[in-house]
Each structure stands twice: as C-alpha cells, then as structure tokens.
Amino acid sequence: MNELIKAINELKKEKNAIILGHYYQKGEIQDIADYVGDSLALAQWAAKTEADIIVMCGVHFMGETAKVLCPDKKVLVSDMAAGCSLADSCPADQFAQFVKEHPGYTVISYVNTTAAVKAVTDVVVTSTNAKQIVESFPKDEKIIFGPDRNL
C-alpha cells in the first residue's frame, strides 16, 4: 500500500494535480486526499486551487460543480457511476420544464443538484444557509425550491 501511496503522490506532483475527497469516501481515499470535506467545501477548494488537474472523489455533481467553477482546469471524477439520490431525484429536463411552466417564480436549488438543474436556478443554497436565504425574500415571493421540499 505504501508503494501505491508513493506513486499517487509522485503523480500528483508531476501532473500538478490535487485530490478532493468527500466525507463519505473510505478512509483510504481520505488519507490520500489533499482536502476532505462536504460538497460545498470541496467546491470552494476547487475554486481556489492552483493545480491544473482536480481529481474529485465524490459523486458526479461535485465534479460538475468543480468544472463550472474552474472551466480552464481538467476535472476527473473517480467514479462517474457514483450518484446522489437527491440529485438523481430531480431530472434536469423535468425540472426545467416545471420552471418554464411557472414564469415569474424565483428558482432556488439545493447544492446537491446537477449542473443542468443549477443552470435554470436563480439561487443555489446549502443546508446551512437555505432557511436564511428563503426568508430573505418578501413573504409574497413565488418560489420554486428543488429538488425537494423537505430541506
């Protein structure tokens, strides 16, 4: 295992890459990651990095978010089949159609959504700031909140 870790660290240096690992990853992945955190923290680290390559060890929407924030960088996702049930519960085409059918509404989406959902969103929130953001709008504001109403 030490040889593998050594090889990974050498490749990170050679390629000017960083590894971002989500809290849900196995300990072995977290051990080699340069940064470990939730989806928001990983996005923030991606946005700040000087690295040319970002290796995202998390679900696919996290890689999409990193690419949106860092369009000039190469973003690699360790497992494209790794999904998020919350993000998967909100198909972008259906969400976009729903938004289209409700003109004049402010669209707020949770950070755990795909880039395609975020593209039709006015405000992206986290679990930490969702209540504060929603309450900052006038009481009569028409709001669509996705992907679910339970947050």
Q: Which residues does each predicted region cover?
A:
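Active-site loop-to-helix "anion-binding N-cap" substructures in soluble metabolic enzymes
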Residues: 1-151
